[in-house]
Curated annotation (Swiss-Prot):
Modified-residue entries (N-acetylalanine), positions: A2
Modified residues (Phosphoserine): S12, S129
Family: Belongs to the eIF-2B alpha/beta/delta subunits family.
Ranges of Basic and acidic residues composition bias in the record: 31-40, 95-120
Biased composition (Basic residues): 41-51
GO molecular function, one term: guanyl-nucleotide exchange factor activity
Gene (UniProt): EIF2B4
Chain positions covered by the region annotation May bind the chemical integrated stress response (ISR) inhibitor ISRIB: 170-179
Main localisation: cytoplasm
Organism: Oryctolagus cuniculus (Rabbit)
A Gene Ontology term for the protein's cellular component: eukaryotic translation initiation factor 2B complex
Protein name, UniProt field: Translation initiation factor eIF2B subunit delta
Length: 523
């Protein structure tokens, strides 16, 4: 058995002691486990000593090789750095986190050196920009839901599309506030049908009549607009005839596109109208090619009737039952504007014998609250009327706020008549619960956190105030520095809404994505 001679030598360069083990002879027995570990440790120490003797030359060579290597840079341990071998201990006074940060900084410096050398050889180095998961690729197109009225390229594209479909385009009216310059400005003075020849137009007369009613404000409210749209589409389907060598499921969808474009030019479509059009298009594309035309048209008209009955009429009845449970005797209920659903809820609760009082809050220029006040007075409900600047003075005596909704967005925000967010904010300051009544067919997958990106600009001339023979702001367009803003909707964050009452039940705003997911799976 060969003896293991242990020699201790002192290194003159570092003052460190290393234990060197002699290998066993060829004729000796096999080394034990302790001897193998000792030999392995000896090799590591020798390797470290050789690198320390090289000193600065080793560090420079490693930096150059790391800059030329395409893979991740590896660091050569020097006197002040820690080796990555597991058998080595962390130097005293320095933590592992500090050493990792030091190595990371050195790697970044080596990458910068590499980029600088590339720039010297072939132009400027590419600028590194932090990429996030939510950003779109640089070469990708950003699809906008609404046409940007201040983008000439998109406007030219819209004009060409309207010309192909033989649909007149609306011209902008007056000067707009710069913050909302991307939204189209609507005016009742610019008529779309002024130069339209009805007999030679591709637009169905029922759709022309509907578009004019939208633009003049004769039909307003999400439910009323959606029902009127489906009735007009039923008339279009009734008068439709499938051309030769065409299928109804394909040709009818193409026929409806210019009609929808015309309605959008008259007034932007609501979320409820988008969902109704999506439903009808799906029903049309599902028509079998072997089915007779009259039978297919009858089925499509029945589908439109079923949509109105289930999504609007029956949904309103279910909401009435849920909302009536939230109205108690002695309540003081604040409502805003005129929501047909809220009006029915209050009248139904009063007819059931509950005694309460209603405060109707209104705002210019539409003054829709007057219609709500008229409905309540006819039903015998005690009501008071005030404008929105005075709402904070009556909220201390209000027990709950009952509001309607134009749409419920996927992030839980409520899109409703402008001023709703202000009322919800003041109600939260007075600890008054805010209840929103909304059918689920108004839920949409759009996400919006403010009222600036997507909204509707109504006629600015509606802001003119008549006082006897004097009309305030009569010649506002003659002043180039004056701009009028008649915003239609605002967005209320979900934090200000306590409960949403739907036909499915009473849910929080955070449950809107769940309802959308269930609806998409059912379809």
């Amino acid at each position: 058995m060969a003896a293991v001679a242990v020699a201790v030598r002192e290194d003159s360069g570092s003052g460190m002691k290393a234990e060197l083990s002699a290998r066993p002879g060829a004729g000796g027995k096999e080394m034990t486990q302790e001897e193998k570990l000792q030999l392995r440790k000896e090799k590591k120490q020798q390797k470290k000593k050789r690198k320390e003797e090289k000193g600065t030359d080793v560090d420079t060579a490693s930096a150059v090789s790391a800059a030329q290597c395409p893979g991740p840079a590896r660091e050569a341990p020097g006197p002040g750095s820690q080796s990555s071998t597991p058998g080595e201990k962390v130097p005293a006074g320095r933590t592992k986190a500090e050493l990792r940060a030091e190595r990371r900084a050195k790697q970044e410096a080596e990458r910068a050196l590499k980029q600088a050398r590339k720039g010297e050889q072939g132009g400027p180095p590419p600028q590194a920009s932090p990429s996030t998961a939510g950003e779109a690729p640089a070469g990708g197109k950003r699809l906008t839901e609404h046409t940007q009225a201040d983008d000439p390229t998109l406007l030219r594209r819209l004009v060409r599309k309207s010309e192909r479909q033989q649909v007149p385009t609306r011209k902008d009216y007056g000067s707009k506030v710069s913050l909302f310059s991307h939204l189209p400005q609507y005016s009742r003075q610019n008529s779309l049908t002024q130069y339209m020849s009805i007999p030679s137009s591709v637009i169905h007369p029922a759709m022309v009549r509907l578009g004019l009613q939208y633009s003049q404000g004769l039909i307003s409210g999400s439910n009323a607009r959606c029902i009127a749209l489906l009735r007009a589409l039923q008339q279009v389907i009734q008068d439709y005839t499938t051309p030769p060598n065409e299928e109804l499921s394909r040709d009818l969808v193409n026929k409806l596109k210019p009609y929808i474009c015309f309605l959008t030019q008259c007034r932007p479509l609501s979320a409820s109208m988008y969902n109704a059009i999506k439903f009808l298009n799906k029903e049309i594309t599902g028509v079998s090619s072997t089915k007779r035309e009259e039978e297919a048209k009858a089925e499509l008209q029945a589908a439109a009737d079923r949509y109105v009955q289930e999504k609007i009429v029956l949904a309103a009845q279910a909401i009435l039952r849920f909302a009536s449970k939230k109205i108690s005797n002695g309540d003081v209920i604040l409502v805003y504007g005129c929501s047909s659903l809220v009006s029915r809820i209050l009248q139904e609760a009063w007819s059931e014998g509950r005694k309460f009082r209603v405060v109707v809050v209104d705002s210019r220029p539409r003054l829709e609250g007057r219609h709500m006040l008229r409905f309540l007075v006819r039903a015998g409900v005690p009501a008071s009327y005030l404008l929105i600047p005075a709402a904070s003075y009556v909220l201390p005596e209000v027990s709950k706020v009952l509001l309607g909704a134009h749409a419920l967005l996927a992030n839980g925000s409520v899109m409703s008549r402008v001023g709703t967010a202000q009322l919800a904010l003041v109600a939260r300051a007075h600890n008054v619960p805010v209840l929103v009544c909304c059918e689920t067919y108004k839920f949409c997958e759009r996400v919006q956190t403010d009222a600036f990106v997507s909204n509707e600009l109504d006629d600015p001339d509606d802001l003119q105030c008549e006082r006897g023979d004097h009309v305030a702001l009569a010649n506002w367009q003659s002043h180039p520095s004056l701009r009028l803003l008649n915003l239609v909707y605002d967005v209320t964050p979900p934090e200000l809404v306590d409960l949403v009452i739907t036909e499915l039940g009473m849910i929080p705003c955070s449950s809107v994505p769940v309802v959308l997911r269930v609806k998409s799976s059912d379809q």
